[in-house]
């Protein structure tokens, strides 16, 4: 995929699913099914429900995405 075929958004992890999958509630009000990126997996970054994350979505399927970055809790003031 090309760089301009992707949409970056922020959201809150609402549910942790098996196989490093997560359900994320985006800022625009949509729920998406996401998986974690390779760098997050390689660096053992733990993502828990309630964490604020940056998500990358494809313009071809807006129901699935990839978690790129976990925003630290001190910087995040949002709650479920």
Swiss-Prot record:
Keywords: Chloroplast, Initiation factor, Plastid, Protein biosynthesis, RNA-binding, rRNA-binding. InterPro entries: NA-bd_OB-fold, RNA-binding_domain_S1_IF1, TIF_IF1. Its main location: plastid. Gene3D superfamilies: Nucleic acid-binding proteins. The keyword Lipid biosynthesis does not apply. GO terms for molecular function: ribosome binding; rRNA binding; translation initiation factor activity. Residues 1-72 form the S1-like domain. CDD domains: S1_IF1. GO terms for cellular component: chloroplast; cytosol. Pfam families: eIF-1a. It is found in: Plastid, Chloroplast. Belongs to the IF-1 family. Component of the 30S ribosomal translation pre-initiation complex which assembles on the 30S ribosome in the order IF-2 and IF-3, IF-1 and N-formylmethionyl-tRNA(fMet); mRNA recruitment can occur at any time during PIC assembly. One of the essential components for the initiation of protein synthesis. Stabilizes the binding of IF-2 and IF-3 on the 30S subunit to which N-formylmethionyl-tRNA(fMet) subsequently binds. Helps modulate mRNA selection, yielding the 30S pre-initiation complex (PIC). Upon addition of the 50S ribosomal subunit IF-1, IF-2 and IF-3 are released leaving the mature 70S translation initiation complex. This is Translation initiation factor IF-1, chloroplastic.
């Amino acid at each position: 995929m090309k760089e301009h075929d992707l949409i970056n958004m922020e959201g809150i992890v609402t549910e942790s699913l098996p196989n490093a999958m997560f359900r994320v509630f985006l800022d625009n009000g949509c729920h998406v099914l996401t998986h974690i990126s390779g760098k997050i997996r390689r660096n053992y970054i733990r993502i828990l429900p309630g964490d604020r994350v940056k998500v990358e979505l494809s313009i071809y399927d807006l129901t699935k995405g990839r978690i790129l970055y976990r925003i630290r809790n001190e910087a995040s003031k949002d709650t479920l």
